[in-house]
Amino acid sequence: MISDKTLRVFLAYKKDTKDVGKFPTVNFLRDYLRSENVEIVTDYKDIESCDVILLVTLKLFSKVRSAAKEFNKKIIAIPFGDHANFKKKKNELILTNIKSLNQVDLICVETKGQMEFLKKSSVVTPINISWFSKPMNQRTSISSLEKTTFNKYFGISNDSRSIIVLGCTDSFKKAQSLARMVPGVTFVFVDISSGSLKHRWITENIPNLYYEIGMRDELYPSGIASASAIVILERWFMDMIVILDAIASNVPILAVDIPLVGTEIQAGTDFIATEESPVGIYESLQDLKHNPISDVASSDLLTKIKNDENHKFIDVIKNEIVSPKEEK
């Protein structure tokens, strides 16, 4: 372990304007590093003075690798921090640059599902499971007034039930069907892909359905905290921070099959595996009435994330800096 001197890390990340609907996982990574008194550097000319390079956007690998070789710096990759590292094809998730990941020094992920996905994708670099996403109750406090921000924005009564539906553009029809099946519940469809303004026009004829392209920063905390449930229609959902925040808020999650974060959902919250059809989701929502939310499992998981010394991301970084560098 290195000394307690202030760490300087180079954060290699490039925002993709096409990713407007995605949750900004890299923002939570920045917040985590700052909470650990880590200095974040983004100017390439400062790499020489950094302790390590954190590679979030894989297409920047060639550029940072040259600097890493010149100044003898290690590269730790965080592939699930940027949706641009993947593409979807026929309901499959495809890693866009396996070669880059096999040339870094270490890969950090947050779940077993993410690690298994990389191994199945022929990634042979050592992979470490460590948490940098801190759940809402460990990084901020939300006042009773702030909890109403989400409802006020959409004009939802505070005593009404609202359900957040997360999915890509092609899942919107399922949200339409759900809203028509349950007129007494408000559904907010958050498009986590590039989005379609046409869908917003459609909601004008469905009074209990709203459409958003991505979740606004000012609405996110109150939306998660006040939701009656979260429905995830995207099979390759990868944003662990959303899962942790739902767990911290005791919000049940309904999902079909989520390989990347499914185990963690089931370990920490009321989880209902549902059919993909709107009817199947509707029946699962009905089951929630007979399935009281338990705070025991969520408390256990969040305490583990807070206290588990073996899974602290900052310690992983420090250990990697001092370990011998292997030639790739």
Give each language-model segment a name.
Residues 141-156, 294:
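A short helix/loop element that forms part of the nucleotide-sugar donor recognition site in Leloir-type
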Residues 157-173, 188:
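Conserved donor-binding/catalytic core segment of Leloir-type glycosyltransferases
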